[in-house]
Each structure stands twice: as structure tokens, then as C-alpha cells.
Amino acid sequence: MKNYIKGKHALAISILAVAPLTALAQAPVNTTDSLKLQAIHDSLDLQGVEVVAQKPIVRMTTDKMTYNVQQDADAKTMTLLDMLRKVPMVTVDGQDNVTVKGSASFKVYVDGKPNQMFQNNFSQVAKSMPASMVKSIDVITSPGAKYDAEGTSGVLNIKLMHQNGQSNSDCSNCYNGNVELSLSNKGERANAYIGGQHGKLTYSAMGMFAWQDFGNLKVTNTRLQQTSLGESLQTTDVEFKQKHPFSFGNFTLGYALDSLSTINVSAGVNGGYTNQNMQPRNSFSGGPYGNGFSYVYNSNQRNRFMGANASADYQRWLNADHTSSLTLSYLFDYNPARNRTWTIYNNVSGVTGLTLSNLFSDSRTWGTSHTGQADLTLDLGKGQTLETGTKFISRRNKSDSRLYDIVDCNDVLNDAGSMLYRNLQSIVAGYAQYKLTKEKYNARLGLRYEHTFESVKYAEHSDRNFHKDYGNLVPSGSIGYNITPMSNLGLTYTMRISRPGISQLNPYTDRTDPTALTYGNPSLAVVKSHNVTLAYNFFMPKVMFNVSLSHDYIGNEIENYQFVDADNKYNSTYANNGKSRNTYVDAFIRWVATKSTTLMLNGNVAYGDWKAKELGYHNWGWSANSYIGLEQQLPWKVKGSLGVFAQTRQYNLMGYNSGMQFFNASLTRSFFKDRLELSARYANPMRSHLIINQYNAGKDFSNLTHVSFPLQVIALSVKWNFGNTKKQFGQRQSKINNDFNDSQKKESPVGNMGM
């Protein structure tokens, strides 16, 4: 106490479990003696102390939201897909389609790295994976220059429950893990996890197998078409079952070479398939079909997919404070898939205006990518940070689609309906990003450049080969102001791009439906989007609140559009013919009402406007969705959870999807010092079946699809936890904001929402 004021001073000290202490001290003249205080422990009974505060379940900054899945009681019973319904700015509709801020154009990362298998089959993977295997979910709506520019609505980063390379000095041989089994009326699931540390080595492994069996799915499709012969009506009714097994495994190793260097390696494999056996009934009348006819045919669809990935990262801290670093990374991805469809017509007669033939379609795709990256972060001092780096991606995609006519039980290749082609893509990128934190203000300014070299080669039709290369300059920036230690305000601007996928580019024509043609467009261009977001965050021990206002604009959006051709065939393809403007208000509220009751609201209201001037299409409308949740501590140490999800009609360029409602309830009880966990879950779509209606219309057609899902779910699960520690062996805390770890952002005073 060197710079004190002469006189008497009152010092009040309050320590948990220690009685408040007030000391009166006389500061004598010309003395530098330390003030000595003795804390007097009061006979305070801790049983009378109640601490009511937020769980650290959500962290929000200007450009990123992190949902801590492991702090959510529903993680013990829900799948990852179910959990996403509770995550701010993420929507899951009745057909399990996932969108971020209303858009399906987002990138999926796993542990901070792009994962192509998750990207290609995200809905199927998410509804098979238990939420207990996920540590947290990042919704990065305004990615900085350090992130890839792809994904017009941002990045969804899934962080799994495994260990990182930095070791803990107080844990020389620690480990923990769990084994879980789940049974439901929709399938079974088994998963296991183990992670730990031995000296400087950290490790983790996880595996999961799930089997889902959905029956009594019903689809009715009604299509009206205007033809030169008048109006025609086509109706398809089908009821079928769907089987979906899925398996997943992941292994990681980390080693601390010294106090400044770490190396991490990981490998993962996954796979699954879906089988559908159907007997659709088709009815036709009017126009070229005259008085009408109907027939039943057999359709058998078998779709298989798998993925394998491996990565290695080396990080070197450049100073003792761990604020400057060099990171070198490599990532490999391999993703083959195969889709087979048999279409068999038996005893069909009286058909006019159609040519029906037995067909077998066999389509195989292979995707391989290699990624190398170098990132340099420099602490410039006085709250300034410079980040720069470079990246190279090499992608090789191959598609072999073959159509066979089935003649006398033999498969005869149809050359006109078959296609083999390769898509080669190389991306070179570089970025620089400057960050400043000064008193109550923070700012980020970044610039990224990506140059793409792409070529498509056809094996049988070399005259169709083409090559193109293009560059994209992608700016981003943000500014934030800390209003109080518990609230902040931020404004961000982000430009994003979306390259067309192989399924959108593939010109192969699917002719398995005699009334329709489905194909891609190899001339699609990269999509550019612009986003401006104003966000406000507020936190108190019992209440946390986030609200954001966003506006998106896309001038050349890839639209999946339909039309009827001169042969009366219903065509579905893609084109850069769309312009869209969307304005969103997202809100998240979490309130600890009492020591045993917590309420949550996650909601979104949006207005969208879509145009395709060349096609003469224009649509607009309001939409909203919300999830209201209740967490309750019940007697006998039982944790209960209730949730209701509701969604209004969702619009697009050519129509809409109807709204839906969904109810979820769960109970969880732990035994033997949290070693054993028993959970039960019930999910109900407010009726025996979840009903979804999809409507789209053009100049010469209208199409209505009615889908019915039996989504009532009753599930029981048992989980056994083991190990000699509850530690999470994460990287040591640093002042650097690393995209690959959990370090807290310096610019956000409410970065760690909770304790």
C-alpha cells in the first residue's frame, strides 16, 4: 500500500464461507508498513448457502456463438440433430434439413477443420450421433479472414469430446471415458469414449454405431401441368420403410515436444447406408393422358456412403507468454458414395403418352482432397494482433453414372443415359487480419484472397470438356463496444462465397422417373453473398440475453428450379438466376428462475424476398421459428427437461414448406457418484405423425408434396462413466484467438457466459 491517503480507512472484505470483515485502519504519517488483517472465520453453516447462477452453456461474441452441449441436461438423451434445434441461429425443419440463419449454404467443420463427410451427409450423421459425443457447437455467422470463404451463411463447427496436445503438469497418468447404450422404438445405438494423458502424451478415441428403422412413411405428390393438349393431372402415392445404419470412429494423439511446441494427429472413419423398398401408385388424367390410367411399380433404392480423414498439426509458440505462434497443418479427406435404383414395371397396361421400361441406375462418386495450411499470429503489443497465413487445397472428384435397360433379366448398358466425368479443383488462398483491443473498444479488419482453378473432363465426350479459373477477394470486418462489464454491442460485415457442388454441376440426367428429368448444370458460377449484422449481448448471474439484426444480399444465387419442356417432361435443374434479400432478427434468452428451474427461448423472425427475373419468378414472405425449453431439478435427484419447437411456413423462390410443431421431454438420474446415468426421452410431433406440405409453382405447372412421418419416439439409455479424473485435457490457456481451440476472445467481456 504505497500510494495511500493519510487518515482513517475502512476496508470491507467478503469471502465465501467467511464472515464479512470490516477493519478500521489508521494510516500513520511517513510509514510504509503493510496493513495486517486477520480473517475471522464465523460459525457459518454452508447448508444455508444457495448459489443461483447460470451454467456456462452459451458464449457469445460479436461474430461467434458457442453452445456448450455438455452443460445441457438434454445431451444425455438427445441426438446431435435434436440438440441443434436449441442452438441460436440454427433451424432444423420437419424433414431434418438444417439451415443456419435460414440458409442451407453453410460449411460444416469438425474440430476447427472442414469435414467433407459431415458436409455431404450432415443430416444423416447428426440424427445418428448422440449429443453426448459433442463438446460444443460453434455458430460462426461472421467468419474472419482466417476462415475459408466458402459458405454463404457461415460456419457450423462441431467440437467432439477428445483431447488436445498440451499436457497438464498435475496429471501424469489420468484418464476418463464412458460407454452408452440406447434403445428406442426407432432403432438402437451404442457408443464409447476414452481419453486421457500419460506424461506429455494426450490421447482420445471414440466410436459409435447406430441403427435407425423408420416405417409407415407416406408421401403423396400431386402435379398439375399445362400442355398444348390441355391440363394434365399426375398423382403419386407411396408408403415405405427406411433403414439407416451408421457408424463413426475417431482417434487423436497429442504430444508436447517442449513448453513451446505441440503436435497433434487425428484420424477418423465413418459410413452408412439407406435402403428403401417402395411400390408407388401413379395416376394420370387429362391432356396427353386422355381419360386417364394408373399403374403400380416396384422401386428399390440403396444408397451407401463413407468417409475417411486424417490430419496433423504442429504449433510453435514464439514467445513465453504464448501470444504469438506458428501453426502448420495438413488434412486429407476421402469420400466415396454409391446410389443404386431399380425400377420394375409388372403387368402394366392401358398406358398412353408414356414409355415405361425396366431400368437399373448405378451412380458412383469419389471425392479426395488434400489441404496444406500455414498460420502465423503475432502479438504486436498494446492490444494489437496480426494474423496472416496461406492455404492450398487440391480436390479430385469423379462421377461414374450408368443407366441400364433390364431386358429378359439382363442389364444392358444404355450409353445415351450414362456418363463418366472428372472434376478437378485447386484453390490457392492467402489472408491477413488485424485486431485491436483498446479500453472499451475492439475492432477486426481482414482480407482474404482465394484463386480457384477448375476443370471438368468427360471420358466419352471430350468436346464437352472445359476449364475455368477465377479469383475472389473477400473482405471482412467488425467493431465492438463494451457498454458495461456484462454487455456489449457489435457490428460486423462479412462477404462469403459458395462454389457449386459436384451434384449441382453434374450434367448427368436421371431418367428413372418416366415423367421427369433431373440434372445439374456444369456452367454454374460461384455465388457471392454480403451480410451486415448488429448484435447485442447482455449477461447477469440469472439472466442472459442475445439479440441480433442481420441483412443478407445475394445477387447470383444458385436456385433449384423446375419447368415443363416441349415433351411434357417435368425438369429439375440449377442456375445462377436468383437474387435474394433476407432480414433476420434472432433472439436467445436463458433465465435461471430458481435454484432448480431454468427457462430458455431461442427464436427467429425473418422476412425474405426472392427473384429470378429471367424466369419471371418472384416470391416473398415472413417466417418464424422458436424453441421454448424448461429444465427442472425434480425430487430424488432427477433432472427433467421439456421443450416445444414451432415453425411457421418457410418460403423460397418457387413456393414454400409448411410449418410444424414438435414436443420433447426427458428425465435423467445419476447413481454411484455419477458413475451410472439412466435417461428416458419421449418425443411427439403433437399428433401421431408429423405432416409436412411442400408447394412450388411455375408458369406452366404446380406441384404439391404431402409427407407424413411417424415421429413419436420413446427412448431409454444407460451410460457408465469410468476413470480416475474428471479433467478435460485441453490446451493451456493463451491470449491468442486460435480457430482450433477454445481460447476465449479478448474483445468480449461476456465471452464466458456463466460462472
Walk through the language-model features, giving the residues of each:
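Short, acidic, small-residue-rich periplasmic hinge/interaction motif at the N-terminus
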Residues: 27-73, 93-95, 101-105, 140-143
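Face-selective signature of the C-terminal outer-membrane beta-barrel domain
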Residues: 248-272, 297-458, 482, 486, ...
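Outer-membrane beta-barrel signature, preferentially recognizing the C-terminal barrel domain
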Residues: 419-425, 468, 497-546, 553, ...
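Outer membrane beta-barrel strand-and-loop segments of large Gram-negative receptors
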Residues: 237, 369-373, 415-419, 519-521, ...
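Surface-exposed extracellular loop regions of Gram-negative outer-membrane beta-barrel proteins
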Residues: 158-178, 217, 221, 235, 453-455, 485-531, 551-569, 684-699, ...
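Short acidic/polar hinge/loop motifs at secondary-structure boundaries
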Residues: 80, 86, 114-141
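N-terminal periplasmic accessory domains that precede
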Residues: 37, 80-83, 122-124, 139, ...
